[in-house]
Amino acid sequence: MIIPNLPSFFVPLVGLLLPAITMVIFHLYIQNDDIF
């Protein structure tokens, strides 16, 4: 019962979390480039 429910919860979580992590890494890269 857990296996079919897991992707239903995991896919939207990754869909929201992945762009957030990408934005954070991009912001840190811009900030680091600005310091240099």
Swiss-Prot record:
It is a single-pass membrane protein. It holds the Pfam family PSI_8. One of its GO terms (cellular component) is chloroplast thylakoid membrane. InterPro entries: PSI_PsaI, PSI_PsaI_sf. One of its GO terms (biological process) is photosynthesis. May help in the organization of the PsaL subunit. Belongs to the PsaI family. This is Photosystem I reaction center subunit VIII. The lineage of its organism: Eukaryota, Viridiplantae, Streptophyta, Embryophyta, Tracheophyta. The gene is psaI.
